[in-house]
Amino acid sequence: ENGMRSGTEPVPLIMGLKGAVEDLPNLNTQLEKQKQLWNYARETLMSRCGAVINSPDDALPYILNISLPGYRSETLLHFLEARNIFVSSGSACAKGHGSYVLKEMGLKPALTDSALRISFCKNNTENDIDLLADALCDAEKVLRKANI
């Protein structure tokens, strides 16, 4: 055993590294697919739901931050969760309160208070984006009618 006892090697980490290395040849293809999906999400959510895109145009295509002014993030989160759609509010740096990152980007409170963070992975499809857009449009109708 060359001086090592069994259990010394971090087998889960080794297997994770193996998987990452095996996936390297597909990285550029996956990145291009993510960019296309991210752009589709931007266009779809803006045109169908009136979403304001907070993410810069040159952001990495794995996270999209949007706002639906007039609707609080937490209210939208619960509405989406009830439909098995899971996103986050604000930014990863500000769980539970207004995001200083979004404020530093120059966003007004109306946008930071309604911000949603959408994360993408290689398994997401345009259909997933369409379902999200449908749910956000429904949320706007229901919440407007309920005066929330």
Predicted feature descriptions by range:
Residues E1-I148:
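Pyridoxal 5′-phosphate
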